[in-house]
Amino acid sequence: MHARVVRNQIQPGKLDEWLALIQESIVPALKGQHGFQGFVAMIDREHDKSIGYSMWDSEADLAASEASGNYQQQIAKLGSVLAGSPARDVYEVTVVA
C-alpha cells in the first residue's frame, strides 16, 4: 500500500471551507479512482495548517491517479483557500493498526 501526503498552509479563517471542499468534492472524486483505499484529513487550527493523506492499493494506482490529472484537478479546487502551493510526498505504508 502507498500513501500520498499533502501538507497545506490555509488562508486565515478558511479551514472550515477547506474541510467542506475535502468532504463534498475531493473525497467523492477519490472514491472513483481505481485502487483508492481511504483518506484522512488533519487540521491545526492554531496555525492554519492541514494535512491530507490518501491511501492506495499500490504505487502504480497512486501514480495512475496523478497521471490521469485527477490530483491536479482536486488541488485546483482548493485554490481559493490555500496560502501557497501544497507540499506533496509519497510513502510506502508499512504499518496500519
In which residue ranges do the predicted regions lie?
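A common structural junction motif
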Residues: 72-74
